[in-house]
Regions:
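Conserved nucleotide-cofactor-binding alpha/beta core module
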Residues: 75-186
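Class I SAM-dependent transferase core
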Residues: 1-85, 91-95, 99, 114-125, ...
Length: 186
């Protein structure tokens, strides 16, 4: 049942132009989004809207179409090193991990302790325990694993923090919603 809903969502996102690459379609096909949802929302895992995560109610799992919007422009390939700022449920990190493969690296930072614990549990349970999950301030990046080929900031920010720019490989790409809650810059 859920795999059918996942396939329908993928086809919907291909038709809408959100999913552009076969690698993105395959990554999303392999990851059971329902495993990254708060238990009371599992039945809605493939509905195109965000849902609250456990905790203070401020963190959400983004609407499913947002992941290809953020990750497709980064053109992640096998072996890339990726920093995700805002781990949320861990779903985005799992997608990035599928895209960069076992020779790549995904580091995901989460500032909220409850959300961090939820992401760690989800990633471990679904076999993505090789994602480096860090509890801390994402605006500082994670210098211990820098340089990164790509950085994805999942929360709105007034500007891209300088420490993240300094941790970006050259050439590299940053994707971030800069300027306000409805802005996206790449």
């Amino acid at each position: 049942m859920m795999s059918e809903l996942r396939d329908q969502m993928i086809e919907r996102h291909i038709r809408a132009g959100y999913i552009k690459s076969d690698s993105m379609a395959e990554a999303i096909r392999l990851i059971p989004r329902e495993e990254f949802m708060h238990s009371i929302y599992v039945d809605h895992a493939y509905v195109d809207q965000p849902f609250p995560l456990p905790g203070d109610g401020k963190q959400t799992i983004s609407a499913p179409y947002m992941y290809p919007i953020f990750y497709e422009p980064l053109t992640l390939v096998e072996g890339n090193r990726v920093l995700e700022v805002g781990a949320g449920s861990g779903y985005g990190a799992a997608i990035a991990r599928e895209l960069v493969g076992s020779s790549g690296l995904v580091v995901s930072i989460e500032i909220n302790q409850t959300t961090f614990d939820f992401a760690r549990e989800n990633l471990g349970r679904t076999g993505y325990d090789d994602v480096v999950l860090v509890h801390g301030d994402g605006s500082l990046g994670y210098p211990a694993e820098a340089l990164y080929d790509a950085i994805c900031i999942t929360a709105a920010c007034p500007a891209i923090p300088l420490p993240l720019i300094e941790q970006l490989n050259a050439p590299g790409k940053i994707m971030a919603p800069v300027g306000g809650p409805h802005s996206v810059s790449g």
